[in-house]
Amino acid sequence: MKLLIVSGGYTDFDFAIDLIKKSGFEIIIAADSGLNFFKAADITPDVVVGDFDSVNQEVLSYYRDNEFIDFHVLNPEKDDTDTEYAIRFAIEKGADSITILGGTGTRLDHVMGNITLLGIGIEYDVSIEMIDAFNRIRVFNKSLL
C-alpha cells in the first residue's frame, strides 16, 4: 500500500500537486502544519496527526469539521515528532511504500532529524523516501533494493 505524508516543511506547490495526481497514493496523511498545504491545494487528507502547535488554527477548524477525516491528536509533551508518529501510523496501516513531502526545507536541523526517521523503514522492511522538487532521499538495506 502506497501512503503519502505531508509534513510542515517547505513544499513546492506545483511539484506536490503533480506528485499527488500521478502517484496513486492509497492513503494521504497530513502531519501537523502539513495540513496548511492541503487547505491551499483544496485537497482533503484521509488522516491528520499532530499536536497542532504549528498549524493555522482556522485551517485546523476547517478540517476538524469533516467527519471523514481520521484525526489523531497527540500530546504536545511527547518524545516522537508528528512526522515520526505519521510514519509509524502508516506502517501499522500496512504501508509498504511511504513518501514524505515537506520533510526538507529551510531548517537543516529538521531535515537531518527527518532523514534519521527514514531508518524506521529498515526496521519494518518498508520503503520510505523523502522527496522535494530537487531531491529524493532514501535509506535501504538489501531487502529494500
Predicted regions: what they are:
Residues 1-62:
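N-terminal beta-strand-loop-alpha-helix module at the start
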Residues 11, 104-109:
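Gly/Ser/Thr-rich loops at beta-strand to alpha-helix junctions
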Residues 65-74, 98:
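Glycine/charged-rich beta-loop-alpha catalytic/anionic-binding loops adjacent to active sites
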Residues 70-92:
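Short phosphate-binding loop-to-helix
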Residues 96-105:
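N-terminal glycine-rich phosphate/adenylate-binding segment common to multiple enzyme folds
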Residues 108-119:
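Short Gly/Thr/Asp-enriched flexible loops that form oxyanion-binding sites at enzyme active sites
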Residues 120-137:
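Short, acidic/small-residue loops that bind anionic groups at enzyme active sites
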Residues 135, 140-145:
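Long, charged alpha-helical interface segments
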